[in-house]
Amino acid sequence: SGVAKFAKYPLTFGPSPISNLNRLSQHLGSKVNVYAKREDCNSGLAFGGNKLRKLEYIVPDIVEGDYTHLVSIGGRQSNQTRMVAALAAKLGKKCVLIQEDWVPIPEAEKDVYNRVGNIELSRIMGADVRVIEDGFDIGMRKSFANALQELEDAGHKPYPIPAGCSEHKYGGLGFVGFADEVINQEVELGIKFDKIVVCCVTGSTTAGILAGMAQYGRQDDVIAIDASFTSEKTKEQTLRIANNTAKLIGVEHEFKDFTLDTRFAYPCYGVPNEGTIEAIRTCAEQEGVLTDPVYEGKSMQGLIALIKEDYFKPGANVLYVHLGGAPALSAYSSFFPTKTA
């Protein structure tokens, strides 16, 4: 694979496992065979998740440059910032996290939302958590630049890790490795996955998978489900990162488009719709697999809808990419009242 030439610092247990979600498949009429690639349990660092795979290719740069602080940014319940806090602890670096107000949470619930879930874990791991009132944007942020400047002015050497690692030059490399794993695991399992379904917001996960699968001429197997609700921006950023990553790994393919299903991101980033809640419950009740209301709940909602619509050919093997995110669930407790037995 073209990613082999890049330095990598191991943060995961190795290739993430693939589970057969056979009860979910049966529940949906046995039309297709659903499998999940479990990025949600890929590491012993603070519950793991997809960002660690990206960070593995960024750490060599951090270690080499002798940086003092890791600085990252996300919403209040960002998984990215939790992972950067864990990484900082692992590397013995200080950590500053900018947690912006990306999600319109009702005032009555804001206090809980700002204290539990991912943000709580980051605080436990010793990060300097800065809660800022700016709204959602997948691009580069003023608050982020300010934090970096402040640390530099104080004589420190901060390392910037942008939202979702996406604007980092190596942000897409981790999921090239993911694509290589899928190809190897197909051989081990004796099956071929017809389609790969993945959540998309800041773009580098999907971009890495696209570039990685393009090594095997299978980039069209990827179906991304938008959870940003700013899908044009997400598509543009994903294509840019995919093309940049393809160049890095020596793949002669120019991405001009990819499948991005935009039907499930409403009402906005970070707020589940009724279908999202239903999908989270369905997956949990059928499989004991937990998905979150921000990312995976929406991609699971998309997967279930596509199966019900007969989007996939009968008997298809569909690989759902579980990117993590469950630590945010406690911040959304009001969406999940007790069901009577």
From Swiss-Prot:
Catalyzes a cyclopropane ring-opening reaction, the irreversible conversion of 1-aminocyclopropane-1-carboxylate (ACC) to ammonia and alpha-ketobutyrate. This is 1-aminocyclopropane-1-carboxylate deaminase. Pfam families: PALP. The keyword Methyltransferase does not apply. GO terms for biological process: amine catabolic process. Its cofactor is pyridoxal 5'-phosphate. NCBIfam families: ACC_deam (TIGR01274). SUPFAM superfamilies: Tryptophan synthase beta subunit-like PLP-dependent enzymes. The active site is at residue 78. InterPro entries: ACCD_DCysDesulf, ACP_carboxylate_deaminase, TrpB-like_PALP, TrpB-like_PALP_sf. The modification N-acetylserine is found at residue 1. Keywords: Acetylation, Hydrolase, Pyridoxal phosphate. Its EC number is 3.5.99.7. The modification N6-(pyridoxal phosphate)lysine is found at residue 51. Belongs to the ACC deaminase/D-cysteine desulfhydrase family. It catalyses: 1-aminocyclopropane-1-carboxylate + H2O = 2-oxobutanoate + NH4(+). One of its GO terms (molecular function) is D-cysteine desulfhydrase activity. Homodimer.
